[in-house]
Amino acid sequence: MISFETRTRMEELEKKYKDILSVVNENEVDREIEEIEKKLTDPSVWDDQKKAREYTQKLKRLKNISEDLKRVRSLFEDLEVAIELSDEDQEMAQHVEEIVQELEGAVKKLELEIILNGKYDPNNAYLSVHPGAGGTESQDWAQMLLRMYMRWAERKGFDVEIVEFQPGEEAGIKDATILIKGEYAYGYLKHESGVHRLVRISPFDAARRRHTSFASVNVIPEIDDDVDIEIRPEDLKIETFRASGHGGQYVNKTESAVRITHLPTGIVVSCQNERSQHQNKQTALKILKAKLYQLEMEKKQREIQEIQGELKDISWGNQIRSYVFHPYTMVKDHRTGVETANVDAVMDGDIDMFIEAELVYFARRSG
């Protein structure tokens, strides 16, 4: 006998599968794979390395989707047979439960593969954290967020490089940027941009009062050098300074840190992680180029958001997620409604539940 809970899960899976098939067709995916494979057999396509790389990335993504579409279809066929036999065989009812559990994982994986179809979704990601008003309290919160994303990246098997790290005077950070290197790093993290709110008993308050702190997160893709963005030397203010950052294994101290201000937009980028001033300058210019490119894309789409590396107002009205440590424990995303009471796991990088829900939420909003 199949339980009511399992039947409910089956109905939800069928709905999700129907939604998937409304936007992707297995035969069309296989046909597109054949077309790209045919193009890649032409030696002339490799004359344009950028185009060839785009083809190979797309081919890899389509092959993953094709394999997972076939797997999900096969699992649904197995489920149909198991359901027919379950009325007479209790062991088969248990097998239904096992297939449903396997299907849930397979459908979720397929959903994400279909959703992660943006031009720069496969790229590495620059992630910056900036504390809001509130001094040491918000600076400590910013460092907690930075660690959360580093732990998430480590869980994914991604590499993390500190690009900039400016410590707070007592604790925490005034500013930090990391480069997360891994397949679809930007695709996963792009909706983490926004204001994150913390409510807790402050460890810096002798009276043990409850404090609310804010920090902003900004995520941009690492883009290729051949992207056509003009940066005129006369538009740049370039300063050098001695790095004062710390961060254990991630930070390589240097006396050749570089700060670049793009005068027309006011965008400021810094780099202190490389071993020479020249390398720091090149990395900072690369980040600036990525920010300017994204700014152009936003203008073309007529979106109102600013993506200059910090939000206009790091305050009450703009938060995307709240992290409450006191008087109860709760982390809640205000866009998707996803929440959990396990704040320790979240702060240790267990944030896939939020990221996956964001991807589905924004994909449905965009239609």
UniProtKB/Swiss-Prot annotation:
UniProt organism field: Thermotoga petrophila (strain ATCC BAA-488 / DSM 13995 / JCM 10881 / RKU-1)
Superkingdom, taxonomy of origin: Bacteria
Gene Ontology cellular-component annotations: cytoplasm
Physiological role: Peptide chain release factor 2 directs the termination of translation in response to the peptide chain termination codons UGA and UAA.
Family to which the UniProt record says this protein belongs: Belongs to the prokaryotic/mitochondrial release factor family.
Listed InterPro entries: PCRF, Pep_chain_release_fac_I, Pep_chain_release_fac_I_sf, PrfB
Name of this protein: Peptide chain release factor 2
Gene transcribed to yield this protein: prfB
Disulphide linkage map: none
